[in-house]
Amino acid sequence: MQNPRTVSDTKRAFYAAHTRPIHSIYRRFIEELLVEIHLLRVNVDFRYSPLFALGVVTAFDQFMEGYQPEGDRDRIFHALCVAEEMNPQQLKEDAASWQQYQGRPLSQILDELNSGQPSAPLNSLNHTGKYSRLHAVGLYAFLQELAGEVTIHLNETLDQLAPVIPLPIEKVKRDLELYRSNLDKINQARSLMKELVEQERKRRAQQTSAPPAVDASSDAPA
């Protein structure tokens, strides 16, 4: 019987697939995501679903926004999926399938869920496997696409969903509060990093364009 993969195995697989260095503010997020997905997938109650896929893709895209060089971002996502033994194309396709609900009112979604036969991928909100923060992120990303501003009063929206989906809504609320707080922090760190890079660029430009200093001693009479 083959021993289950460990967190260390998953990390090694990732760094074997992506050998280029990763900027420090992003590396911590990637390693935390690697661990989170690994621990979820080795759980016997884990069930892959389009909701999980949307959560993974959304979390990655939002936290890795602005990563340079841009081409490395896709390579990092591919390496992450390889390390977790997931199909990156399937994740992206399943995440994109939620776009069919863009602009729909929440009331219509509630009606479909109440019907007992929601269409795919909406039916993955009837999640009965192991819950994780990534399911909450996927739900939040889905709600952001609906008509109106249902995420402004997020807790009220989640309370409306509570009777018709089996997700642990109170955990979802706490996880999303922490998720949005962490996203704000990394956005602030990104902004600061951009400012520092721009300041350094201007400083170097000024040094390059400045005229050479004149040695006053050379003009002194002999």
UniProtKB/Swiss-Prot annotation:
Cell cycle in keyword set = no
Renumbered to this chain, region (Disordered) spans 197-222
Note the coiled coil stretches, chain numbering: 169-208
The answer, when asked if Iron-sulfur is one of the entry's keywords, is no
Q: Which GO terms describe its biological process?
A: photosystem II assembly
Q: Which residues cross the membrane?
A: none
Keywords carried by this UniProt record? Coiled coil
Identify the Pfam families for this entry: ThylakoidFormat
Q: Which GO terms describe its cellular component?
A: plasma membrane-derived thylakoid photosystem II
Q: Which InterPro entries match?
A: Thf1
Q: Where is the composition biased (Low complexity)?
A: 209-222
NCBIfam families per the UniProt record, alphabetical: PS_II_psb29 (TIGR03060)
- Homology family: Belongs to the THF1 family.
Q: What does this protein do?
A: May be involved in photosynthetic membrane biogenesis.
Name used for this protein in its record:
Protein Thf1
Q: Which organism is it from?
A: Thermosynechococcus vestitus (strain NIES-2133 / IAM M-273 / BP-1)
Could you tell me the gene encoding this protein? thf1
